[in-house]
Amino acid sequence: QHLKARPQLCLPNPVAWPLPRFAPDPDPIAWLLRRNVGADQQLLLAVGTKSHQKGFDRLVAMFGLLAQRYPAVHLVILGLDQGPYHGVDQQAQLRRLLPQASHRLHFPGRVGNVQDWYERADLFLLPSRYEGFPNVLLEAMASGCCCVSSDCPQGPAELIRDGVDGRLLANDATPETWAELVSELLEDSGQRRCLGDAALEVRQRFSEERLRRCFMHGVVQLVGDD
């Protein structure tokens, strides 16, 4: 207003369905069975390559609170490479936070069939400290996964309508608060199913075709302002 700046058009990323597939593509059921995780055991899933940004330390702290109460629940984190990342072994760092239940914390690494893992998961969790636009959350919702995210800057609140198609927690929510909500959802398959079914709507809301139309409409408006 004061600097006479031109109007800006900001569009989110689209989601293509089905999600792209590429190698490696380990079957989640077979991969987990080799680690004594049966198809009937509940699975918490997180995805990301940067542990601190994604709040995986928060996630592991929460899981530590739940592990004794739910001995059959496992936590899978996709995307973290083995060995040092910018001088830090992220997998080892997280395992050290969970000494009593580290055998229930699994790191398949980077996979190219993430859709299969979303569909295997009972809950998708994103306790990020900050985001740009969380593609992994968009993908999980498009897969019909029940999702819980921190309401961090920026992005999750653009995707999740709290209590309608997912759940949002304050960015500074404690591990205890996370554990309470995750416990509620683990014990309520009906609520998980309702939230996951409603989340499928992002396939239309963030489709390539719809965002293409939004872009063209925005361009026409910007040109018309000249």
Task: Describe the function of each predicted region.
Residues R21-V37, A92-L94:
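A short helix/loop element that forms part of the nucleotide-sugar donor recognition site in Leloir-type
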Residues R110, R129:
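Aromatic "clamp/platform" in nucleotide-sugar-dependent glycosyltransferases that forms part
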Residues H74-H103, Q191:
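Short, structured helix-loop element that forms part of the nucleotide-activated donor/catalytic region
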Residues C146-S150:
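Short hydrophobic beta-strand element within catalytic cores of glycosyltransferases
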Residues G38-K54, V60-F63:
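Conserved donor-binding/catalytic core segment of Leloir-type glycosyltransferases
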Residues E208-D226:
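C-terminal alpha-helical cap of glycosyltransferases
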Residues Q1-D27:
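Donor nucleotide-sugar binding/catalytic pocket of nucleotide-sugar-dependent glycosyltransferases
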